[in-house]
């Protein structure tokens, strides 16, 4: 799927039976959630449910990658269908139907990162300084770049904590990292969005975010 499919109103309705707004700042996440809802709906027609494990939309592109685990049974199907609905974004647009459940699975992402670490060369067992590693196996520059991109995507997704509300708010000229730290210090949950480096999601009310932004 291309997230740009979710921008023209007619295309979104025709392909996914959903509504979205090309003017909404959460357009990339909306596209991801519409695709996840379409996946859950397709599974439900065959008596199956889905667990969304990882979603990724590479910066600078309009493509979406979704990894899910299919589960058999009517109970799993009903549980997935219950996570599909409509929602209002912080920009005031009503969108959907879309997936309202988590977009990342922390246990799955930790296993992915552990697998990435396992692909690194082991420490030198024949002496040498602590932490010294054997020369890495030859790898093409393209393969190395893919490995770096995969690790970064997993790390960003893991940091975008499950359990926070859908959708994010733009941080303007303020540092997203600084605002996340300020919100956490004030007792709120917050994380940077994995879909836009200048946006964050939080359980804090909008007024609180605005006050911190102006401080």
Where are these regions (language model features)?
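SAM-dependent transferase fold signal centered on methyltransferase-like domains
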Residues: 1-215
């Amino acid at each position: 799927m291309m997230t740009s499919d979710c921008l023209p109103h007619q295309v979104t309705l025709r392909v996914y039976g959903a509504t979205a707004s090309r003017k909404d700042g959460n357009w990339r996440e909306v596209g991801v959630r519409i695709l996840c809802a379409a996946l859950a709906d397709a599974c439900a027609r065959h008596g199956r449910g889905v667990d969304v494990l990882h979603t990724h939309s590479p910066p600078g592109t309009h493509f979406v990658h979704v990894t899910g685990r299919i589960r058999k049974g009517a109970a799993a199907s009903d549980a997935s269908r219950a996570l599909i609905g409509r929602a209002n974004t912080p920009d005031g647009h009503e969108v959907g139907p879309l997936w309202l459940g988590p977009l990342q699975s922390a246990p799955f992402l930790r296993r992915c990162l552990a697998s990435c670490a396992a692909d690194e060369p082991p420490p030198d067992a024949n002496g040498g300084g602590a932490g010294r590693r054997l020369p890495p196996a030859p790898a093409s520059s393209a393969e190395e770049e893919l490995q770096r991109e995969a690790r970064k995507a997993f790390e960003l997704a893991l940091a975008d904590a499950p359990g926070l509300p859908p959708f994010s708010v733009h941080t303007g000229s303020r540092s997203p990292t600084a605002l996340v730290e300020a919100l956490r210090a004030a007792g709120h949950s917050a994380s940077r969005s994995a879909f836009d480096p200048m946006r964050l999601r939080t359980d804090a009310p909008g007024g609180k975010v605005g006050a911190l932004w102006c401080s």
